[in-house]
Every structure is written in structure tokens, then in C-alpha cells.
């Protein structure tokens, strides 16, 4: 009996890849045979790389992404520190395409639209726009922020912070056709009133990609200015960039993405489980969205689902085990904490957060200076203190 996955974005496609490679029969249902270009996550790193490696999927992303392992971090034009971790830059649609190619059985993809799900303690019935039906033991909802199907099941989205953050993306290049003096760069906002968390510049197919993360009202006139005159507006908001970028040009249109912080209620139902943004959204600036998605995929597809399928039925007692998984809960809670922390550290002009902001960057810079003299010393000291 099949497992049905509704939604063929990154979460659904990765779940299908993990399950089919483990020998399970899967129906991945999405109305698009080829996922369209969308501005979403454009970089993989840190915990995401670790989980993809454990799942046996990393090489496919590493082979197609632009690899970089050194990021220069600056604020007000001065070096804060240097990050040395492996990252891969690639657009969201190619990420989804890679995940779909990793599906062991290509016939698992059904290009259709789910109109209705009839759940039960035993079998789940999905009615498709084509008139066909799919019967499955379990339905994995990976529909992202599209709420029609969850809503039809009585699952409601609860907005915790409306329009919490903004992400903008565009591609830049040196005006003289040469190369930038860095492999990747992060420039943090220079004053709280601007609401700029950071600008991340990294390599991607087609040039150097710039992702700007802000805590501003989407209707603020500055948004229109960034879209119309991205270069001049960026240099006005982050003047310290000029000495590191030199003369540059923006070579494509500015894309944007507004994110609400939200989760769901009414989700504990027989035969249906939600993963990724379908269950909870994350702040793009915090960089926790794909990490959460991957934790969901790993815990569901390698731990809980194999256990569920050893016995009959798919009641709420099984589904509840996933939602109460300690790793999942920790990941979800960390994402919300980081969302609020990044906003306060970036845009709270109060005395407390102004002091905390100064100390945050001072500590990072001091560690960087000490490590330049005695490489690895601060890391060893931190390890001894934790022990």
C-alpha cells in the first residue's frame, strides 16, 4: 500500500526520495511536472549539510551547487569575523529538481491536483482533479503555506506574527567584469532604525547572489526604492559595503518574499501528518526553515513511519508520536526563538538590545582576533567550559 505525499516542493520531494530509496511505494502528487522558479531558500549549509549527508542525499546537491567554505562577515565596513563552513549556493527550483531526481521510482510522481482527502484510522482516500483516486496508508502534507487542503480537513493556520520579516534576492556582478575579492560575504545592518538584519552574498550559477533580510513593513516606501534602484538604495542603507564590493551592477530583477510566523492547530488527525512549512513557518533571516524541514523528513521517514507500518492502522496515537518527537519539538522551538532573537537583535532600539547588539559583535570580533593569533584556541576553551 502506498504512502501519499501531497505537495512536490522541497519537503515533499525529499520525503519521496528518502522513502523510495528505502523501498517504500510512494505517490508524490503535485500539479506541476517541473517546479517553477520561485524565490525561496538559495543556500544550504550547517545542519542542513549534516542531515543531507546522513540521508545519503548530499552528493547530488554538492555536485550541482556552487561550493564555498569561507565567508567574510562585516559590519559598518569593518571585519567582524570569518566563517569557515561548507555551503552550497543554488536556486530553489534546481534544489527541487535534484530532490525529484533522487526519487528511486520516477513513476512515483503523479502530475495532478488533490481536491479532497478522506482520512480514517485505516486507509486514506485522495480524490484528484483528473477524477482518479489514490488510496494510501498515510498522507504526508507538504503543501507549504498553501492552506486549501489542510483547511478542508479542519486544520487551521494560526498566525503568531503577521509580516514578520522580508527577504529580497537579486544577482550582482563587478562593473568591470572582474571578480569580487571574496568568495562570500555577509554584511550586517548598521543601525537599528533601518531594520536590516544582513545582506548575504554568495556564488550561484549565473553570478553572485545577494539575499537581503529585513524587518520592515512590506508597504514601506523603502521596498519600492530597493526594487527600482537596488544598487544606490543598498549603498545608502549599508554604506560600509562600498569598500568591499567596489563598483558593481545588479544584473536581474529584485525578487521579494514576505513571511508570517505561523503554525497550525487541529492537525492531530488519523492518517495525515504535516511536515515543513505546512506545520510551522520560519524566519528566513534565521536560516532555520530548511533545517526544520530536514529534521521533519529525517525523523518521520527514517524513525516513525517505518515503525508505524509494522502494524495495522494509522490512528492518532501513531501520528502523535511524530508531533511529540523530541528532536522535532527542539527544532520547531529553536526556529521560533531564533526568529524573535534576530528581529530584536536587528531592530529593537531600546537600551537593553542596543547593549546586547554591541556585545554580540564585540564577542565575535574578539574571538576572531584571538583565533588569528592562536588558531582554534577559543573553540578548545569553549569545549572545556561545556565539559
Residue ranges and their predicted role:
Residues 1-11:
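Beta1/beta-strand and adjacent pyrophosphate-binding region of the FAD-binding site
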Residues 6, 20-40:
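Glycine-rich FAD pyrophosphate-binding loop
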Residues 142-241:
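Conserved FAD-binding catalytic core of PHBH/FMO-like flavoproteins
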Residues 218-310, 314-315:
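FAD/FMN-dependent oxidoreductases across multiple families
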Residues 11, 34, 146:
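Conserved Rossmann-like nucleotide-cofactor binding loop
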Residues 50, 54, 61-155, 159-165, ...:
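Conserved N-terminal helical subregion
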Residues 247, 302-387:
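C-terminal helical "tail/cap" subdomain of flavin- and related membrane-associated enzymes
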Residues 33-53:
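Conserved N-terminal glycine-rich FAD pyrophosphate-binding loop of Rossmann-like flavoproteins
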Amino acid at each position: 500500500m502506498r504512502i501519499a505525499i501531497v505537495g512536490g516542493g522541497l519537503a515533499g520531494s525529499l520525503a519521496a526520495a528518502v522513502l523510495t530509496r528505502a523501498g517504500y511505494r510512494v505517490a508524490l502528487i503535485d500539479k506541476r511536472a517541473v517546479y517553477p522558479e520561485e524565490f525561496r531558500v538559495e543556500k544550504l549549509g550547517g545542519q542542513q549539510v549534516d542531515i543531507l549527508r546522513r540521508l545519503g542525499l548530499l552528493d547530488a546537491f554538492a555536485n550541482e551547487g556552487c561550493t564555498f567554505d569561507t565567508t567574510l562577515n562585516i559590519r559598518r565596513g569593518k571585519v567582524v569575523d570569518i566563517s569557515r563552513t561548507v555551503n552550497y549556493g543554488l536556486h530553489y527550483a534546481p534544489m527541487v529538481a535534484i530532490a525529484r531526481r533522487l526519487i528511486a521510482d520516477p513513476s512515483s510522481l503523479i502530475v495532478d491536483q488533490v481536491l479532497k482527502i478522506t482520512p480514517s484510522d485505516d486507509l486514506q482516500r485522495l480524490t484528484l482533479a483528473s477524477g482518479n483516486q489514490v488510496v494510501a496508508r498515510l498522507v504526508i502534507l507538504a503543501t507549504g503555506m498553501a492552506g486549501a487542503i489542510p483547511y478542508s480537513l479542519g486544520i487551521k493556520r494560526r498566525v503568531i506574527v503577521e509580516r514578520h520579516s522580508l527577504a529580497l534576492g537579486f544577482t550582482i556582478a563587478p562593473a568591470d567584469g572582474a571578480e569580487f575579492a571574496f568568495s562570500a560575504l555577509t554584511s550586517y545592518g548598521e543601525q537599528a532604525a533601518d531594520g536590516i538584519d544582513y545582506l548575504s552574498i554568495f556564488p550561484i550559477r549565473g553570478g553572485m547572489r545577494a539575499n537581503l533580510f529585513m524587518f520592515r513593513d512590506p508597504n514601506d516606501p523603502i521596498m519600492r526604492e530597493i526594487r527600482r534602484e537596488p544598487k544606490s538604495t543598498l549603498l545608502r542603507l549599508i554604506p560600509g559595503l562600498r569598500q568591499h564590493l567596489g563598483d558593481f551592477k545588479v544584473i536581474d530583477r529584485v525578487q521579494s518574499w514576505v513571511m508570517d510566523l505561523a503554525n497550525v492547530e487541529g492537525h492531530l488527525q488519523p492518517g495525515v501528518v504535516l511536515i515543513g512549512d505546512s506545520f510551522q513557518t520560519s524566519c528566513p533571516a534565521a536560516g532555520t526553515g530548511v533545517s526544520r524541514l530536514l529534521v521533519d523528513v529525517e525523523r518521520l521517514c527514517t524513525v516513525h513511519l517505518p515503525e508505524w507500518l509494522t502494524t495495522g492502522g494509522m490512528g492518532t496515537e501513531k501520528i502523535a508520536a511524530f508531533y511529540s518527537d523530541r528532536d522535532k519539538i527542539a527544532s520547531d522551538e529553536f526556529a521560533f526563538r531564533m526568529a524573535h532573537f534576530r528581529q530584536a537583535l536587528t531592530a529593537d532600539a531600546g537600551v537593553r538590545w542596543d547593549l546586547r547588539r554591541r556585545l554580540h559583535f564585540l564577542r565575535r570580533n574578539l574571538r576572531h582576533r584571538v583565533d588569528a593569533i592562536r588558531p582554534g584556541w577559543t573553540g578548545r576553551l569553549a569545549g572545556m567550559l561545556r565539559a
